[in-house]
């Protein structure tokens, strides 16, 4: 049984599949959560955003289509709880106003963490810098 939760965003998730700075730390953190029965949660948006990033990398010739397709299949089978709740819309909207954000994509990730009162992990330095002061549950890896 899962005893605790953490929330993640697409930048964190994609580092499990794409070799980038801090990918090793992200993989280590993910394994630690799974081994310790931590439930990893994210808004359903994460699947769309991660798939879109991979598609863009294929389009730009950075990734092979077959490799990207395999990554998407692996994402689909991850031990990741996808969250959709009506409350997310209102929370994300309010967080967007606080952060003066032009879009709400990142705010939906923050809203999941706020709704479930759990730590939020991102690999997006810009998001971390803009949100950490207002939302101390935000962590960067």
Cite the ranges covered by each PLM segment.
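A general alpha-helix detector
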Residues: 12-13, 49-54, 71-75, 91-92, ...
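Alpha-helix capping/helix-boundary segments
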Residues: 12-13, 46, 87-88, 108-109, ...
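Acidic catalytic patch
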Residues: 44, 67-99
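Short, well-structured N-terminal submotif of metal-dependent ribonuclease cores
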Residues: 1-45, 57-70
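Acidic, PIN/NYN-like endoribonuclease modules and their adjacent C-terminal/linker elements
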Residues: 1-5, 98, 110-141
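Phosphate- and divalent-cation-binding pockets in alpha/beta enzyme and binding domains
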Residues: 25, 49, 91, 129-130
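Short beta-strand scaffold positions
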Residues: 8, 41-42, 83, 104-107, ...
């Amino acid at each position: 049984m899962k005893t605790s939760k953490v929330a993640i965003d697409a930048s964190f998730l994609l580092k499990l599949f794409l070799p980038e700075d801090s990918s090793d730390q992200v993989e280590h953190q993910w394994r630690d959560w799974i081994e310790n029965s931590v439930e990893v949660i994210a808004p359903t948006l994460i699947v769309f955003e991660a798939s879109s990033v991979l598609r863009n990398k294929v389009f730009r010739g950075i990734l092979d289509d077959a490799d990207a397709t395999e990554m998407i299949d692996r994402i689909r089978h991850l031990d990741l709880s996808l969250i959709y709740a009506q409350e997310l819309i209102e929370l994300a909207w309010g967080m967007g106003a606080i952060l003066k954000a032009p879009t709400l994509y990142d705010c939906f990730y923050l809203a999941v963490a706020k709704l479930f009162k759990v730590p939020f992990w991102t690999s997006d330095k810009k998001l971390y810098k803009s949100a950490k002061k207002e939302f101390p549950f935000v962590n960067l890896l």
